[in-house]
Amino acid sequence: MIPFKNTPWGKPIIAQEIAPGVWVVATASHGGFYLNTDALARIPDAHQAYAARWSHGHGPNWFEEDVAACAVIVAFPELIVACPELFDAESVEDARAIVRCYIDREISQ
């Protein structure tokens, strides 16, 4: 069962659990990831705070697809095996670079 009825970006069109507690979500206009409390524990607090800024008041469980989602990909490298149609080793390396260049840089300022 989907643990949410709405997202920060509107009503979900697609919501699929791709790993325990990790949901990929798409709406008509945007998307990202939703993490339950157990999955969220794998995300560093600073990355959760960064993601919460883009969740439009929906809290730290939402990671928008443009930048914040990279924190999820880095924290869950097993998504390469669980979802090879969405992720590969290059996806994880790209996500690490984005976390380093954007998220970590912004939270350190």
Region locations from a protein language model:
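Charged, low-complexity intrinsically disordered segments and flexible loops
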Residues: 1-4, 17, 46-56, 67, ...
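Generic structural motif recognizing short loop/turn segments at the entrances and edges of beta-strands
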Residues: 19-22, 29-31, 57-61, 95-98
